């Protein structure tokens, strides 16, 4: 509904439960068109760290891109933007605009700058693929802190660490487009011109002239993982007799 009302594309993270897997959750990104149609979903391939206690990993079938009027869209969730093989899989499908969404992590180790780490991943993907990367990261609000204080007395101390979140847009040269947000909830505005992706590719097009696919061969299993595969079809007596009759007629 929000996509239709605002005539925009939406990429949003959700908790997804499969219709037949009632005890399994996936960390899923949905891509939604301006008409409100779900273009596709991407299930995070590997839950990060403690996420493994709650979410399961997706399969290769959701490593897809979507050809739209604003460019070829692709998305990865949070820490999997560190995975060069997953990122290259999207690049190789012609990705032009990449959406990377993250959680704010104020509880990261003191020597780990989460905001810089998020931005660095986006800069790397944009510079390597000569594409735009849109980064959206949640932030810990005062409302969240107050709610957590009901259960954890020192929640404010734990959740107010600086540089725990970054949102912004990275251009195909690896630089920030416009202004970014650090530790704040808000809206980032930036103008994207896909023509800017062309000139840098004349120098380094890792999908074409600047690669050696006679040497490197990346193979991706896009098979949907299912809990059951029927090897042999089961026939009823009537269907078996019918198949025999058909076979005899063909022999005649």
What is the role of each PLM region?
Residues 1-11, 72, 78-191:
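CN hydrolase (nitrilase-like) catalytic-core segments centered on the catalytic cysteine
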Residues 21-25, 160-163:
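Short, solvent-exposed loop/turn segments at conserved positions within beta-propeller repeat blades
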Residues 28, 41-43, 65, 71-80, ...:
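Active-site-proximal beta-strand elements of phosphoester/diester hydrolases
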Residues 31-34, 170-171:
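Short, acidic, Ser/Thr-enriched surface-loop or helix-capping motifs
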Residues 48-64, 81-85:
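Active-site glycine-rich loop that binds ribose-phosphate moieties when present
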Residues 62-68, 190:
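Short acidic-hydrophobic surface loop/beta-edge motif
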Residues 137-252:
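C-terminal beta-strand edge segments of enzyme domains
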């Amino acid at each position: 509904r929000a996509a239709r009302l605002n005539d925009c594309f939406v990429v949003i993270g959700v908790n997804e439960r499969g219709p037949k897997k009632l005890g399994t959750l996936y960390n899923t990104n949905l891509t939604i068109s301006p008409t409100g149609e779900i273009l596709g979903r991407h299930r995070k391939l590997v839950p990060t760290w403690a996420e493994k206690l709650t979410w399961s990993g997706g399969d290769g079938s959701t490593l897809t891109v979507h050809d739209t009027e604003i460019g070829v869209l692709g998305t990865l969730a949070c820490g999997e933007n560190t995975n060069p093989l997953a990122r290259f899989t999207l690049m190789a499908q012609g990705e032009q605009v990449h959406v990377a969404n993250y959680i704010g992590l104020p509880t990261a180790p003191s020597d780990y700058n989460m905001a810089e780490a998020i931005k660095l991943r986006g800069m790397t993907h944009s510079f390597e693929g000569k594409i735009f990367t849109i980064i959206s990261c949640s932030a810990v609000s005062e409302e969240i802190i107050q709610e957590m204080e009901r259960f954890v007395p020192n929640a404010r101390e734990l959740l107010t660490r600086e540089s725990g979140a970054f949102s912004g847009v990275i251009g195909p040269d690896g630089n920030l487009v416009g202004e970014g947000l650090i530790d704040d909830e808000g809206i980032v505005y930036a103008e994207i011109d896909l023509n800017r992706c062309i000139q840098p590719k004349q120098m380094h097009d890792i999908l074409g002239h600047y690669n050696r696919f006679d040497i490197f061969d990346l193979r991706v299993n896009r098979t949907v993982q299912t809990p059951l595969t029927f090897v042999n079809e089961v026939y009823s007596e009537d269907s078996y007799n019918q198949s025999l009759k058909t076979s005899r007629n063909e022999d005649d």
